[in-house]
Structures are given as C-alpha cells and as structure tokens.
Regions:
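Gram-negative/organellar outer-membrane beta-barrel architecture
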Residues: 117, 219-415, 483, 498-502, ...
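C-terminal transmembrane beta-barrel domains of outer membrane proteins
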Residues: 210, 282-291, 303-308, 312-313, ...
Length: 586
C-alpha cells in the first residue's frame, strides 16, 4: 500500500513539473547576408519565449517566406534546433541556415491590352540585373500606377501574369522572368461636376473654389487636394475626397458630397451696471457678435461686433466681403471700426483691400485705409493725445497650405505684410509746439507663421511665431501694438502690454477628440519693447514673459470655442487665468 502511494505521488509530481513549458534562455544566430536583428524579427522569437511543439517548423516557414520575398529562393534551414540545458526549465535555440544563391531578374515582359502614350518601361527596366525582390517590384508597380492616375488614367490595372524561375545551364545562376499585363482603362477628363448636399450654398460657389476647367485631364493628386480647398470656405463639415465615375455617355463626372454647417451666427451677452454712487448714472455693458459668412449661399460675408468693456471703453466694427469679383479671382474686403479708449481718445478706421487669389494656396493683397484719432475733452496733458488723421497703404502676402482651417493636421500658414501710414497732426493747438513734427511717416512690418505636423494618429504639434515692428519718429499710444491674452500670450490680461516692437511664440501639443475638437497643452513666450518718451514722461519698458497651461477647443454652433487655463511666469495655481475665445473667422 505504501509503495502504491509513493508511486502515485511521483507520478503526480512528474505530471505537474512537465505541465510547465520550457523557455528559451539564449538564441544563437548564424547569417551572412542578413543581420541578427532581421532574423529574429522574421522568426518572431525572443529570449524567454515559451517552447511549444512545432516551434522549429514555424521558424523555418517564417524565414523561408521572408527570404523568398527578398530573392533568396534556395535557402536551407536544417540547422535550426533546440538544445536542452542542465536546468530543465530552459533551452538554447540555434538558428543556422544557408541562404543559398540569390535569384536575379533577367527579363521583364510588358503586355498591353490597349495603346497609350505612357511609357512604363522606365519604371521596371532598372530592376533587370537586380536581386528579385517582391517589395521592389511592388514599389515599381505602385509608382507606375500613381503616374498613370495623375495623367488621365484613373482606372489603370497592372497585373502580374506570372514569374518564370529557371537556372542558367552553364553558370548555375538563378534567374526570374517577370510577365506583366497592363490595362490602361479609359483616358479620363473631368467633364461634369455634380455637387450633392448643398441646401443653401450655390453650386457655382463650390465649383469656382475647385478651380477645375471643363474637360481638364484627371489627376489623382489634384482630386485629393479638393477637400482642403472646400474646407477653407468654412461652410461645410470636413469634406471627403470626391468620387470619380464615367456615365453612360462616356463623360467623366466628379461627384462631390458636402454637409453644410451653420454659417450665420449670433452670440452675445448684455448687462447693466448700476450707479455706484450718488449723481452717477448706470451703463450698459456686454458683447455682441453677428457673423453672416455665406449670405444667401453666394459666399458673400458680413459681420458686426460690439463690445462695451466698461463705462468709457467701447469697440464697434463692421466688415463686408465680396468674393470673386465679377467671376474673377479677386476678393474685396471692407472694414469700418471705432474704438473709444477710456477717457483719452476715439479712434475711427475705414479700410478696404483688394485680394488676388493667385492659386488655391497663395494670395496677395493691396490695402488702403484712412484713420482719425480724436482726443477726448477730458484728456489731460499727461496723456497728450493728438488730434490726427492717417492715410495708410500696404501690401500683404499669404500662403495657406493647411488641410483644415480649424484643426489642421498638416500644412503651414504664413502671412507677411507691410504698410506705410502718413500721419498728420492737426491739434489740439495747445500741444503743438514749433519743434513738434506734425507730418509723420509710420512703417509697420508684420510676420506670422504657423506650422502643423501630425506626430502620431490624431496627435498634432502646432508651432507659431509672430513678430511686429513699428518704425517712425514719433508714436502715440493708439499706434502701438498690443500683446497679451488669448490670441498671443496666454496667462496675461488681454492687451496687457504695449510696444513698438512685439513678438511672441506659441507651442501646442494637440490631441484631437473629433475632427475639429481637441485638447491641448501649450507654452507661450512674448516680448515687447516701448522706447522712452521724455516729453510725455514715459519710461522705456521692455520685458520677456512666458505663459503655459492646458486648454480645450470645441466645435460648436457658434464656431470653435477655445477655453484655456494659463499661468504666467511666477504665478501660483490660484493666480491662473481662464481665457475664452470664439474662433469664427470672417
């Protein structure tokens, strides 16, 4: 009885120990042509891998597959074996093999089902005399397909009819003859454009943005660019790549499907601030934005902005856009702007510009504007705001290759402008002295660059750099550039700093939640310089600041709402600022 129990226990222990698989402790690889890293990657084995029945056969099959794809069709894998160790839990794996002689491409025969002027030989001739490599052949076929698709043949087919393998009877070398069958398909032109889904926008507004002439030859690269052109209109949800088909009349039809979004928006808030002391009147404060970006579906746009900051400061702005003047690629823009700044001055501007749409990515504009600065009767000698009139002329260059205006995954936005303002001071008389220069020329230089790059899926790096400089013999406060806030240096108040020279940079890491909504972390830097003005008791001010934080940009019916929490240099968490902004481009 005791012997039977002992025997049963030994049997159980043996079964229990054998249930644990052995693991690979060391892998020895021998190779002449390929690296050890390549062999291990193709064999899909690593140290600590558990040994299973058929492991060596799996390694042989995987290596044979990868070797043959790279032209080594005569390999021998008899040297793959598993060696047990004294420690029964581990084994060593030895991978020895013979690659054999490579197989070389001898001939490439191309058969055509129809005739065309496209010469495909140049895409395959260079393969002759090379090692027969599956991936090189596929790459050549893809290049030939791409070339044909961009040259009027979207329905081309290239088929590998066969590969004939043989050995040279004299030298014993291995060769392969490749037989290809090419069917060009119908040569295609874009004869019609069919737009679907546009309930408000006119067809001609969409087709003119495409810049496709009737009968233009088909190009796949151009077709893939069309969504970017339509997205810039900001009338639609992200547009998909158009489809191309041949109708019963053998005409090429480009089918574009769009989904319209809200383009006419109103948002605002109105409040009333009661009097804080006897004898004082209350006042209305608030913000109103009206944006009509596609009037009657014609692409015309108008906007109205009103904001009452406090009792004495107010902004009013009216804009209008007339696109594609008389059917030509020229846009006319007009702006009427008025700002009341505290109790110091009233600024009024009337500007107009003519923009030439040179290509779908590049535009240039000339602008002219008039401006007047009217000092308030309450202004004192310390502020010394002059009554002046300004005539401004300028030029602007814009390059925009972004794939989407709201949440781009790639592309750049570059804007460079120059303007010359002729300023004439006409009062108040008590401030005008004999040595005061009353005719002043002011030059403004502006540079802005944004670059976007998708590092990983739905993760985008955005980098922006902006610089502005004002040159002239004499500056007033209304002439200076403003820095700080949601659109420049976050972590600081809106327009907190003034300077004749300002610059800032923005670095954002964005994670896309939807196509046009994303969360982001940011790091901003900003610099400003305002030179001293001894006559007005203004000291020189110059500083470099940083801001950083996190934010969220969400697409809404009113536009894209950007909300961020930012900290300035030296701020504690409780000192952080929350910035709100609606990106609703005019």
């Amino acid at each position: 009885m005791l012997h039977r129990i002992t025997y049963s226990l030994l049997l159980i222990l043996f079964s229990f120990s054998s249930s644990f698989p052995q693991s690979i402790k060391k892998i020895v690889v021998g190779s002449n042509t390929f690296t050890e890293t390549q062999i291990l990657q193709w064999a899909q084995v690593t140290p600590s891998l558990s040994v299973y029945p058929g492991l060596t056969d799996s390694i042989k099959n995987r290596l044979a597959f990868n070797f043959s794809n790279r032209g080594y069709l005569n390999s021998n894998f008899d040297g793959i074996q598993i060696e047990p160790l004294s420690d029964s839990a581990f084994v060593n794996l030895t991978i020895n093999f013979t690659e054999g002689e490579a197989t070389y491409v001898k001939n490439i025969f191309i058969e055509r089902e129809d005739s065309s002027l496209i010469d495909f030989n140049s895409y395959f001739d260079f393969l002759k005399g090379q090692i027969f490599n599956k991936y090189s052949l596929e790459e050549s076929i893809n290049e030939a397909l791409t070339f044909a698709e961009n040259n009027s043949y979207p329905f081309i087919k290239i088929k590998i009819e066969g590969i004939f393998l043989y050995d040279d009877s004299a030298s014993g070398d291995h060769f392969a003859d490749v037989h290809l069958l090419i069917d060009n398909g119908q040569k295609s032109t874009i004869d019609k454009i069919d737009v679907k889904g546009n309930t408000s926008t006119k067809d001609y507004v969409i087709t003119r943005e495409l810049r496709i002439e009737q009968g233009e030859e088909y190009s796949q690269t151009m077709i893939e660019e069309l969504p970017k052109r339509l997205n810039r209109l900001r009338y639609f949800e992200p547009v998909a790549t158009p489809q191309f088909l041949i109708n019963t009349e053998k005409e090429g039809v480009l089918l574009i499907e769009v989904k319209e979004k809200q383009t006419n928006n109103f948002d605002g808030i109105i409040g009333y601030i009661p009097a804080s002391k006897e004898g004082e009147k209350g006042y209305v404060t608030g913000l109103v934005n009206v944006s009509l970006r596609n009037l009657f579906g014609t692409g015309r746009a108008a906007a109205f902005h009103w904001q009452q900051f406090n009792r004495f400061s107010q902004d009013v702005e009216i804009k209008y856009l007339e696109p594609w003047l008389l059917g030509y690629p020229f846009n006319i823009n007009g702006t009427l702007y008025q700002r009341k700044q505290d109790t110091t001055y009233v600024q009024r501007k009337l500007e107009g510009s003519l923009e030439y749409l040179a290509t779908e990515d590049i535009s240039a504009a000339v602008l002219v504007g008039t401006e007047s600065i009217i000092p308030s009767q309450n202004a004192n000698s310390y502020t010394r705001i002059f009554n002046s009139s300004i005539l401004t002329t300028g030029v602007n260059l814009k390059i925009d290759t972004r794939d989407d205006p709201y949440a781009p995954k790639g592309g750049v936005l570059f804007i460079n402008s120059y303007s010359l303002s002729r300023k004439k001071i006409i009062g108040p008389q008590e401030f005008i002295t004999p040595d005061l220069e009353t005719n002043i020329n002011l030059q403004r230089f502006t540079f802005s660059f944004w670059g976007f790059y998708e590092l990983f899926t739905n993760q985008v790096i955005a980098v922006g750099v902006t610089g502005k400089e004002l040159r002239g013999s004499f500056f007033e406060e209304s002439d200076l550039f403003k820095l700080g806030g949601n659109n420049s240096l976050r972590g600081y108040r809106e327009e907190q700093f003034l300077g004749s020279r300002v610059a800032w940079s923005n670095l954002e890491y964005r994670f896309l939640l939807t196509r046009r909504s994303y969360a982001f972390a940011f790091f901003d830097t900003g610099y400003y310089l305002r030179n001293a003005d001894e006559e007005r008791n203004i000291l020189k001010s110059e500083d470099f600041n940083i801001g950083y934080g996190i934010g969220l940009s969400i697409e809404t019916g009113l536009g894209v709402l950007a909300v961020s929490f930012a900290l300035a240099k030296g701020d504690s968490f409780s000192d952080g600022k929350i910035h709100f902004g609606i990106i609703n481009e005019f």
